Amino acid sequence: MCSSDLIGVVAPKEWDAIKASQKLKVNWTQVSDPFVDMNQIYDHIRNAPVTKSDKNEKGDLAAAFAKAAKIVEAEYEWPFQSHASMGPGCAVADVKADGTTTVWTGTQKPHFAAQGVAGCLGVPVEKVRAIWVTGPGSYGRNDAGDAAADAAVMSQLAGKPVRVQYMRYEGHGWDPKAPASIHRGRAALDAQGNIIALDFNSKGFSRLETNSTEAEPGDTLAGMFLGHKGQRTQAFNLPDNAYTFENKKLSWETVAPTLAGPSPLRTSHMRDPLGPQITFASESFIDEVAFAAGADPVEFRLRYLTEPRDIAAVKAVAEKAGWKPGKAGTRRTRRGDIVTGRGIAYTQRTNTIVAMVMDVEINEKTGAIRVPRVTVAHDCGLIINPNALKRVIEGNVCQGLSRAMHEEV
């Protein structure tokens, strides 16, 4: 079946559809603007023109840096990453002759998916009913909504209910990606090792190149190939923490997408929308500044926190982990080829405070990394379902470790 640039194979049995799709021979027109070489992606981001920017600034950074006893600078890189849910997107759609449509989907926002499906089908949204069913997970904006739109278009063409189940390589290849980005930190220290100014900038592809709501047909794969235009909003994020520096500038900049048209390299929200990227970089930088100041990483963070809940979370995780005060970089111990260290990170998101201490072992001979213990302080206010929260925390730890070590695409 073919509608505009959307091609699909429908068969009574899944394996028959797979075999038939593998035998298709399709001639595509080559686009004029190819992908950036992934080996050059960070240089591309550094040099690309800025499409949009925003900042949060207070104090006089220029004066503070001019009188600094020491200046610390660092840069961090974050690659494109797939949402990589436990299973790729799947949906079932039943489009009747009069346009009445039912879609069964595991997307995070079925109400918005119904709007996107209606746009792809050219029917009023009142005719579309989206029923949420348990899926493999939805982490920001994965491929679940795309599967719903694909199934609906195929059902409309076939005149029968259609189930779309992406192959694993399709899910990894075509789902919206976490945007690649670079993050630069610059801090001014006085003679006592205190931060008197901090400048932190993130630059990368937009977190809303593909809108996370799926409400517009152009923000779904099917809609893109049917010729619909997406919203293509330019946006990134600022670090989400409560550090109080007298002089501070937090800023972000976005660059244009690598392709202007339908593309398998679409960028969108990753988890909270960009918490992993920004927290990784901003907290790594706080550690580097603590090291330059000769300070303990826990004590150094507490210097700049004033909110009771933030302070309590950092203190609680340090106590539970058995944190022993000492200069940053001095916790390394050795047992044969195994070097052990520990670190702390803290962040907040929508009034939830999280602090974490992680013990890490590295085999210097083989390069193998092992994390024997993770301690988490998680203050989200009133807890309604302790078991669900426990799973959220454990899932965050597992996914964070996996993304840190394995999931560049």
Residue ranges and their predicted role:
Residues 383-398:
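Conserved phosphate-binding loops in nucleotide/dinucleotide-binding enzymes
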Residues 1-382, 406-409:
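Structural alpha/beta core scaffold segments of enzyme domains
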